[in-house]
Amino acid sequence: MFDVIVIGGGHAGVEASAAAARMGKKTLLLTTLIEQIGAASCNPAIGGLAKGHLVKELDAMGGFMGEITDEAGIQFRILNESKGVAVQGSRVQIDMDKYRIIARNKLLKLPNLEISQEQVSALIVENDKVKGVKTNLENIYFAKKVILTTGTFLNGLIHVGENKLQAGRVGELASVNLGNYLQTLGLKMGRLKTGTCPRVDATSIDFSVLEIQDGDVNPKAFSFRSRNFNPTQLPCYIARTNTTTHEIIKNNFYRAPLFTGQIEGVGPRYCPSIEDKINRFSDKESHHLFIEPQTIDATEYYINGFSTSLPYEVQTQMLHSVKGFENAKITRFGYAIEYDYIEPTELKHTLELKKIKNLYCAGQINGTTGYEEAAVQGFMAGINASLSIDMKEPLILRRDEAYIGVLIDDLVVKGTKEPYRMFTSRAEFRLLLREENAILRLGKYGYVLGLLSEQDFAYIQNIANNLQKGLEFLLSKEFTPNNQNNAFLESLGEDKISSIVNFQKIVARASFDIEKLKKLDPMFETMDNYSLREILNEAKYCHYISMQKAQVEKMKNLSELKIPENFDFKSVSGLSNEVVEKLNHHKPPTIFAASQISGITPAALDILQIYIKMQKKKA
């Protein structure tokens, strides 16, 4: 008898099984190929805009992805560095082979975790409660909780031109029996599609005609726990399609599964295939292609931006039309893959299914796309399954606390009909949810759960103390416009002042940096750069942060007004049939959750608030 069984060893499965095992739960990870644990099935990179935030938040609570990325990273960049800190994002090219090996080895060393190479064929469900699983080897395993992290494997169907192949990804069997079994549970399910790009032999690429894209000169680690960080970095390259490429693709639209009706699933809006781009943006004469090394030895390159399901011979033809790729040899062809998913409105915020008790879902099965989105869901599912076993309150992150909270709330409340990708624009309070303050926001949860060490938490507390001391100093001290103070400002390269201002106003200037902050007071010279960056950020955005915190308080009031689990919305007079239907479908746990549902009007919310408050008074 296991406490937790995790089905699938992708990024969600890695984090789910690790979290449960590290929280003291006897855990079993079942996966089709042990060698493929933690595999990056598509692009060789972790992070990016908003995705980097997710990894930082995961790391802040003790997840594995950030640490593994730092160990396997071969190029480190901060995206949007010229823009505000709220929308900057860390992105790391990884050695895909090394990443996989590190992930597998970290799991194999966990004392409470067993791993078995088996494919689950069915669940054992009694009275709407999951009790265990059955596998293709006819083994039966019982567990208190089961977490589905099946990725693209549920009835996975690969498309290349007119050809179709049942598979979870190339070279691995689709999970047909489990996919069919889930259809019998009365869950709302759908079909989604994603795709991948060709990989090319490095010796066949003419790099001399490509634009080089180097990593940052002073790379920053993803994980605050990474020690002795000094990575070897490789360049990426940029190529461009041209009108000849586009003509080849257009001439073969009739062979594209995307357009022939062969593919039924909905693809990712923000990561379209090259044929979809040519069709949708027919006026563009060129599209960027990012040429990314797959490993540190750089023998193969991933052609990012060239995702396709066109026939093999067409892929070769269109790639040869790109400058620098005239003699390119494709080592692995691109393809599209369709798979089953469960509509995420079927889930609670804990990621447990509403209809099947003790059954949790994480990753692409919930309608998301991306390694990072999958990893954080797996982590939260593993945590909440473990907390439930211990009869403890679940960990549900609010929208103002974390991008993880935004992601899960969007899925559970709004649902999705297309692969969901995280963006900074999805977060209402993104100035509060910066990458670098993730440890200050979420470290306490990781520590309480036993996923962060005493040493790690002490480091976080030290930064928090430095931040508090630094801000108190800046807000309490004043600059008067005398000759001595103005001379000091001029020595820093700053403009003089003509009226009394506090230090925070000086530090808030765009030109004020860490080196200048150190000269402001000896206290700052003793602080580490992490603390100093946070003091600068808080000082520069002080006014806007205060505004967002006021908005958060309003949201909290709505979030604290809970709607009873089996609430009868029909009993509320004044609500239209449409509103009642939507509320019954989504079953929002709070008034705030109800406010996020499309079509729920402010008037309906007012009526609902008044009714629930009256019922609470009567009780």
From Swiss-Prot:
Molecular function, one GO term: flavin adenine dinucleotide binding
GO annotation, biological process: tRNA methylation; tRNA wobble uridine modification
Gene Ontology annotations for the cellular component aspect, listed alphabetically: cytosol
Entry-linked PROSITE patterns: GIDA_1
Superkingdom, natural source: Bacteria
SMART domains: GIDA_assoc_3
Cofactor: FAD
SUPFAM superfamilies: FAD/NAD(P)-binding domain
Residues the entry annotates as binding NAD(+): 267-281
Keywords on record: Cytoplasm, FAD, Flavoprotein, NAD, tRNA processing
Pfam families, A to Z: GIDA, GIDA_C_1st, SAM_GIDA_C
Location(s) in or outside the cell: Cytoplasm
Residues that, per the record, bind FAD: G8, G9, G10, H11, A12, G13, V120, S175, Q364
Family annotation (InterPro entries): FAD/NAD-bd_sf, GIDA_C_N, MnmG, MnmG-rel, MnmG-rel_CS, MnmG_C, MnmG_C_subdom, MnmG_C_subdom_sf
Keyword tRNA processing: yes
Oligomeric and partner information: Homodimer. Heterotetramer of two MnmE and two MnmG subunits.
HAMAP family: MnmG_GidA
Primary role: NAD-binding protein involved in the addition of a carboxymethylaminomethyl (cmnm) group at the wobble position (U34) of certain tRNAs, forming tRNA-cmnm(5)s(2)U34.
Family: Belongs to the MnmG family.
The name this protein goes by in its record: tRNA uridine 5-carboxymethylaminomethyl modification enzyme MnmG
Species of provenance: Campylobacter jejuni subsp. doylei (strain ATCC BAA-1458 / RM4099 / 269.97)
